[in-house]
Amino acid sequence: MPKALTIQRSTVPSAERLNYTKRLKALRSHYSAANCRFWVFEELSLPGAFIEFTEADDEQTLSVAHANAPHKTLDPSRVYQEVDL
């Protein structure tokens, strides 16, 4: 079964950075417990511009993890599926 992935972009003002990183830590713990992988990257040339990736081994696992997340994803229905090359 192909892996499933969601992507979320966020722009965080410097005054909110500490709260945002706390939120990310809670999400990382949640997704890890839900058998998902969670990565966050910040754009080098634009501090505060983040992109979050959440991946699972299948779409069902990912959908359930998003539905139960402590902080909601903006559009959890936009799921990307791994392409077998």
Language-model regions, residue ranges each:
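Short S/T/G/P-rich N-terminal loop/turn motif that feeds into the first structured element of a domain
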Residues: 1-85
